[in-house]
Amino acid sequence: MLDTKFDELMEFPSSFPFKIVGDASDTLADRVVAVAQSLAPDDYTPITKVSSKGTYNSVTIRITVTSKEQIEQLYTQLAAIEGVKRVL
């Protein structure tokens, strides 16, 4: 697991923003939502932006998290999506 201090800095449950940057793809947002649904079922409306050259997409999604471990799982699984370069 990751060595984070989310439990010291946050109160749970909390709405937590994730920004995922990946290769330009029409399905990136759908894959991000699928991971979010698997760990924190809810209705999600991700915001997708395309980079100025069209090379990358960024997807921002707010997820209600209930624990430090859940945040760490989300970071790990979102980063494992094919084509993802960064999870912020």
UniProtKB/Swiss-Prot annotation:
Classification via Gene3D superfamilies: 3.30.70.260
SUPFAM superfamilies on file: YbeD/HP0495-like (SSF117991)
This protein's GO CC annotations: cytosol
InterPro entries: UPF0250_YbeD-like, YbeD-like_sf
Alphabetical list of Pfam families matching this protein: DUF493
PANTHER family referenced in this protein's UniProt entry, alphabetically: UPF0250 PROTEIN YBED (PTHR38036:SF1)
Family membership: Belongs to the UPF0250 family.
UniProt protein name: UPF0250 protein Shal_3239
Source species: Shewanella halifaxensis (strain HAW-EB4)
